[in-house]
């Protein structure tokens, strides 16, 4: 016979094979209460849940268009036990009312992997247009503008300026990009001047980091000019 163990169907930290799984999308006008009423819960049970978790999750934060999952008992009673809300691809909130004596809500991230990428380009028009042409995400453009906010006036960028960025992307399920984690290093050639930026962790406990140039000077502290955002490029 076939002895290979069946791969467990794990998502949100649960083995989904142990539950009845209902997936849906929050509709305009939906509330947590209405959704749970449709799923066989009473007003008093819903009130109890909402009051128990209000310090950790406000059910009014549920947004139309976002997916949710209800895990219920697998037997014929199909009693809901968990409500899982996904505000974005990476994060999810679990509301646990499997035991009415200890109702809780907690935030989690899906398992993700970090992929290191390198990109470079030569400015043809504006920085944002050039990065766009190179298929680079807006998030990276904004992070780059933050790195050099103190040293480059982005309104003065000109044709022929060039850049190189080493950065980290977050992926879930191996192929789905869920955003830029951070920039490790960047290089900008502007007006013939070479500007380097290296990301150093300044406090590993607080997880704070700062960018320094090739001489070890903090970019932020050296040039306390007004930061330039992308709105005016």
PLM features per residue range, with description:
Residues 1-217, 221, 225:
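Intrinsically disordered, low-complexity regulatory tails and linkers that flank structured modules
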Residues 229-232:
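Beta-strand/loop subdomains of soluble extracytoplasmic proteins
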């Amino acid at each position: 016979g076939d002895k290979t163990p069946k791969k467990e169907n794990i998502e949100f930290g649960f083995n989904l094979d142990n539950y009845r799984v209902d997936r849906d999308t929050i509709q305009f006008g939906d509330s947590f209460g209405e959704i749970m009423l449709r799923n066989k819960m009473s007003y008093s049970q819903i009130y109890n849940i909402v009051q128990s978790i209000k310090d950790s999750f406000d059910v009014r934060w549920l947004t139309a268009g976002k997916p949710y999952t209800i895990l219920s008992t697998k037997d014929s009673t199909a009693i809901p036990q968990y409500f899982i809300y996904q505000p974005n691809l990476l994060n999810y909130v679990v509301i646990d009312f499997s035991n009415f004596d200890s109702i809780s809500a907690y935030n989690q991230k899906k398992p993700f992997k970090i992929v290191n990428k390198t990109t470079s380009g030569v400015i043809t028009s504006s920085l944002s247009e050039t990065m766009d042409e190179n298929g680079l995400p807006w998030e990276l453009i904004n992070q780059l503008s933050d790195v050099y906010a103190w040293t480059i006036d982005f309104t003065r960028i000109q044709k022929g300026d060039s850049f190189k960025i080493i950065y980290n992307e977050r992926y879930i399920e191996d192929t789905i990009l869920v955003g830029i984690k951070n920039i490790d290093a960047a290089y900008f050639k502007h007006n013939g001047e070479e500007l380097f930026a290296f990301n150093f962790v300044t406090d590993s406990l607080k997880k704070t980091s700062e960018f320094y140039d090739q001489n070890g000077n903090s970019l932020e502290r050296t040039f306390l000019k007004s930061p330039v955002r992308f709105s005016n490029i």
